[in-house]
């Protein structure tokens, strides 16, 4: 038996509405948005393949969360299936500024041996976002 992946991570936000709109513009699916809006769910999540980011909206309290987690504390690397140019266009079309890259990076695939290039940006809470493109 072994740990084989990440099911979800969690991050707090200072402005849930702004975060939902930002990630929707980038093409992500927001899970449980309607339930969160109606008050039947305390959180919503951003779906990424078979994993998700649970978003803790402002005012959310739970006993099982990072005790020092604050909006902007998260660093996430997404995998982009396409070219660097296509990723740059997607970000530009979504109004997202690339703050660094493209540049060569060491990703996780094949224990860091696959060549990759990445681009960096920030979301509305100032979380660091990276898009990894395996070449």
Where are these regions (language model features)?
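Helix-adjacent hinge/juxtasegments
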Residues: 63-82
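A short, acidic/glycine-rich surface segment
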Residues: 32-33, 60-65, 105-112
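N-terminal beta-strand motif that seeds the catalytic metal site of vicinal oxygen chelate
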Residues: 1-18, 26, 74-76, 132-135
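Vicinal oxygen chelate
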Residues: 2, 45, 79, 88-135
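Core segments of cupin and vicinal oxygen chelate
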Residues: 11-58
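Active-site/binding-pocket entry motifs
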Residues: 52-53, 61, 97, 104
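Short, conserved charged micro-motifs
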Residues: 18-20, 83-88
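Exposed loop/turn and edge beta-strand positions of beta-sandwich/beta-sheet ligand-binding modules
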Residues: 5, 40-42, 72, 115
């Amino acid at each position: 038996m072994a740990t084989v992946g990440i099911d979800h991570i969690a991050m707090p936000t200072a402005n849930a509405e702004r975060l939902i709109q930002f990630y929707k513009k980038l093409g992500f699916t927001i899970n449980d948005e309607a339930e969160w809006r109606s008050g039947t769910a305390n959180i919503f999540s951003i779906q990424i393949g078979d994993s998700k980011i649970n978003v803790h909206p402002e005012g959310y309290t739970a006993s099982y969360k990072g005790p020092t987690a604050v909006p902007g504390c998260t660093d996430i690397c997404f995998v982009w299936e396409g070219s660097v140019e296509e990723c740059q266009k997607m970000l530009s079309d979504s109004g997202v500024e690339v703050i660094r890259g493209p540049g060569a990076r060491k990703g996780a695939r094949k224990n860091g041996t696959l060549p990759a290039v990445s681009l960096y940006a920030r979301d509305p809470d100032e979380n660091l976002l990276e898009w990894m493109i395996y070449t």
